[in-house]
Curated annotation (Swiss-Prot):
The gene is bamA. Belongs to the BamA family. This is Outer membrane protein assembly factor BamA. InterPro entries: Bac_surfAg_D15 (IPR000184), BamA/TamA_POTRA (IPR010827), D15-like (IPR039910), OM_assembly_BamA (IPR023707), POTRA (IPR034746). The keyword Transmembrane applies. Keywords: Cell outer membrane, Membrane, Repeat, Signal, Transmembrane, Transmembrane beta strand. Transmembrane segments: none annotated. It is found in: Cell outer membrane. Residues 24-91, 92-172, 175-263, 266-344, 347-421 form the POTRA domain. GO terms for biological process: Gram-negative-bacterium-type cell outer membrane assembly; protein insertion into membrane. NCBIfam families: OM_YaeT, PRK11067.1. HAMAP family: OM_assembly_BamA (MF_01430). It comes from Pectobacterium carotovorum subsp. carotovorum (strain PC1).
């Protein structure tokens, strides 16, 4: 039987001469060339069915429908009597995707972009998409100044209609800016203007921001910087007329020319506010006041608009429109600001939801909210909730979204999206140190116990000079009003002589409890009561120690040189503790802005064996240098003072110390300040006042009753760390300074003869500088620092590299 076949080659040509005006009836549909695609799937994508009478338009629609599936490179439709024959060539399946030569763009990012374009393993390969991808990647390289870059897609056929896809990159080098020319500037020099750019034709060694490598985005940012510079100085008619970027023939150098018109300076003649002000006209006008003769300032105009939006947002107007239309008078060189305000609808909050708190209970987050459900929306209250969640320290990140309720004109839902971090730490370690010998440490700390927000911890230390155990518990919401309750129990056996301190042994234990009372958003007060028992023994006579014992009426027998007293002194003390805290940091760990400050006082109450008070102050402030918070300046101040009451002195075992990773880095722990002046008594001596001082042993630290420590840090982005881990690592350069002194110290002929310094001086500041790295590891915060002492005194001990677990600042 002769077969009559006709090919429909183009959708634009008619086949009426073949099929006739009435077309033909499809009795069967037959496919040729199908491999991966099932016949049923192909039939479903066609608009033609067996029994249909079809014509030219139907054939065209069939071809278009099959191409639209993305499975075929070629489609042909033929007729054999009443049978419709569909010949197809399937697109090959992608078996693998690899990259070569890409250094500036990571594989993961490339895969994400390819998948967004439909190019992924297991899918059909669209060769036309590859051309677009090649061009898009090359355009990206051009935008970052790599004009010699090329991207080539290499397709390697495999059996069973499969292919390997490989993108081969030739990145080349970044074109460097040879010169930046500014044409049209009169009031300011080109050097002054270019100094504000990120792109530079010359970069001084100290400039860590400037860059000679051309990037299109950075140029756009620099042009905006230039525009803002002039608009903020009254040049209301300033305009950038054109920008030319030209390449050198070898595509390695770039010349940038910026043509601009400065215009003249304009002053503000007045401000008019009109529109729907929602009854807050007086407050809004207070935000738009100007000084007589004030220059036009673009940034101030923007700030006015933002302030008006924030004001209306506090009253529930979540989506106000504020548009400023400058009315420029070229005759007298003035500008009048016409501010149009549309407050819009007033919204109230239907629901507050939390997303991502898999461990923390909703109630723990909800009690931090200042925005209430059912109340008018206050944007400032919503932001306060975000800040309070960040300060908890339970979350790596906190984001908030305000969404309109569909179909309701005046309701919104507020959703806080949190990413929880590990708030519990368990550590066990065995180490060896030159001072501590073999050391065992173990501890468990959970700042968000079972998601309740309560903090529970137990820790212990065992080494050559200390055995310490502590159990602590804090409930930050002991009452619904936010009154906190904390308590601790501890035991400590401390052999100071083995810790490079003055010779004595102290066995102490105690219990304490504290109530905290919130005053407002950022301030709180604390009051508590502690009981502490101290049992002192093995005391080697030295001036500060025996001065204290004499003040409390203890006069042990004089011992000879090198021996320790057999005296056993016990003290039972009750302390009243009070304190004030201020905190407006933007987050609980690794803050970037805000201040944390605290002042504390404790005093021994009647019935105690000791009579003294102790005051401490600690403050840290963070000042971001960039909007991203990656560059931050931090300043910290710590100070303390203690003194006796009723003629008694402060116990030497409760002195202040400095030096080490938590105070003045670069110095050994607790070694800054007064040293022990040991008595050197001969046989038969009856009073220490007649004994000379041992001038050969002035190294053991004894601390003092006054302390001051200052720190300044520049927090910088951590190099070689991806954005994924940047939030858990912090690098900083620092300068530390501090001292400890004894206000009750008096040099005697014996101490002078032994060469003992005057420990009453507060001016003997030690200074160090260095670099620190903090890492919020799965084991808890790890702190590494390397510091070099810049200013030190006799008897100080250096320690350049220091490492600490569980401490951040």
């Amino acid at each position: 039987m002769a077969i009559k076949k006709l090919l429909i080659a183009s959708l634009l040509f008619s086949s009426a001469t073949v099929y006739g005006a009435d077309g033909f009836v499809v009795k069967d549909i037959h496919f040729e060339g199908l491999q991966r695609v099932a016949v049923g799937a192909a039939l479903l994508s066609m608009p033609v069915r067996v029994g249909d009478t079809i014509g030219d338009d139907d054939i065209g629609n069939t071809i278009r429908a099959l191409f639209a599936t993305g499975n075929f490179e070629d489609v042909r439709v033929l007729r054999d009597g009443g049978t419709l024959i569909v010949q197809v060539k399937e697109r090959p399946t992608i078996a693998s995707v690899t990259f070569s030569g890409n250094k500036s763009v990571k594989d993961d990012m490339l895969k994400e972009n390819l998948e967004a374009s439909g190019v992924r393993v297991g899918e059909a390969l669209d060769r036309t998409a590859l051309t677009s991808i090649e061009k898009g990647l090359e355009d990206f390289y051009y935008s970052v100044g790599k004009y010699s870059a090329s991207v080539k897609a290499v397709v390697t056929p495999l059996p069973r209609n499969r292919v390997d896809l490989k993108l081969v990159f030739t990145e080349g080098v970044s074109a460097k800016i040879q010169q930046i020319n500014i044409v049209g500037n009169k009031a300011f020099s080109s050097d002054e203007l270019i100094s504000r750019f990120q792109l530079r034709d010359e970069v001084p060694w100290w400039n860590v921001v400037g860059d000679r490598k051309y990037q299109k985005q950075k140029l756009s940012g620099d042009l905006e910087t230039l525009r803002s510079f002039y608009l903020d100085r009254g040049y209301a008619r300033f305009n950038i007329d054109s920008t030319q970027v030209s390449l050198t023939p070898d595509k390695k150098g770039i010349y940038i020319t910026i043509n601009m018109t400065e215009g003249e300076q304009y002053k503000l003649s007045g401000v008019t506010v009109k529109g729907n002000l929602a009854g807050h006209s007086a407050e809004i006008e207070g935000l738009t006041k100007i000084e007589p003769g004030e220059l036009y300032n673009g940034t101030k105009v923007t700030r006015m608009e933002e302030d008006i939006k924030k004001l209306l947002g506090r009253y529930g107007y979540a989506y106000p429109r504020v548009v400023t239309q400058p009315e420029i008078n070229d005759a007298d060189k003035t500008v009048r600001l016409n501010i149009n305000v549309d407050a819009g609808n007033r919204f109230y909050v239907r629901h507050i939801r939390f997303d991502g708190n898999d461990t923390s209970k909703d109630a723990v987050l909800r009690r931090e909210m200042r925005q209430m459900e059912g109340a008018w929306l206050g944007n400032d209250l919503v932001e306060q909730g975000k800040e309070r969640l960040n300060r908890l320290g339970f979350f790596e990140s906190v984001d908030v979204e305000t969404q309109r309720v569909p179909g309701v004109a005046d309701q919104v839902d507020v959703t806080y999206k949190v990413k929880e971090r590990n708030t519990g730490t368990f550590n066990f370690g065995v180490g060896f140190g030159t001072e501590s010998g073999v050391s065992f440490q173990a501890g468990v700390q959970q700042d968000n116990w079972l998601g309740t927000g309560n903090s529970v911890g137990i820790s212990g230390t065992k080494n050559d000079y200390q055995t310490y155990v502590e159990l602590s518990l804090t409930d930050p919401y002991f009452t619904v009003d936010g009154v906190s309750l904390g308590g601790r129990i501890f035991y400590n056996k401390f052999e100071a002589s083995d810790a490079d301190l003055s010779d004595y042994t102290n066995v102490s234990y105690g219990v304490g409890s504290t109530l905290g009372f919130p005053i407002n958003e950022n301030n709180s007060l604390r009051v508590g009561l502690d009981y502490v028992h101290n049992d002192l023994s093995d005391m080697r006579p030295q001036v500060a120690m025996w001065r204290y014992l004499d003040s409390v009426g203890v006069n042990p027998a004089v011992v000879q040189e090198g021996n320790k007293s057999s005296a056993d002194f016990k003290a039972n003390d009750f302390f009243l503790n009070t304190g004030w805290s201020y905190n407006n940091l933007d987050r609980g760990y690794f803050p970037t802005k805000g201040t944390r400050a605290s002042a504390n006082a404790k005093i021994a109450v009647p019935g105690s064996d000791n009579e003294y008070y102790k005051l401490t102050f600690d403050s840290a402030s963070y000042y971001p240098l960039t909007d991203s918070g990656k560059w931050v300046v931090m300043g910290r101040t710590r100070a303390g003072f203690a003194d006796g009451l009723g003629g008694k002195e402060v116990p030497f075992y409760d002195n202040f110390y400095a030096g080490g990773s938590s105070t003045v880095r670069g110095f050994q722990s607790n070694t800054i300040g007064p040293k022990a002046a040991y008595y050197k008594c001969a046989v038969g001596a009856t009073s220490y006042s007649n004994c000379p001082i041992d001038s050969t042993n002035l190294d053991d630290a004894v601390g003092g009753n006054a302390m001051a420590v200052l720190s300044a840090e520049l927090i910088v982005p951590t190099p070689f760390i991806s954005d994924k881990y940047a939030s858990s690592v912090r690098t900083s350069f620092f300068v530390d300074g501090g001292t400890v002194w004894d206000t009750n110290w008096e040099n005697t002929p014996a101490t002078i003869a032994a060469g003992v310094p005057d420990y009453s001086k507060a001016s003997n500041f030690r200074v160090s500088s260095g670099i620190a790295l903090q890492w919020m590891s799965p084991l808890g915060p790890l702190v590494f620092s390397y510091a070099q002492p810049v200013k030190k005194y006799d008897g100080d001990k250096s320690e350049q590299f220091q490492f600490n677990i569980g401490k951040t600042w």
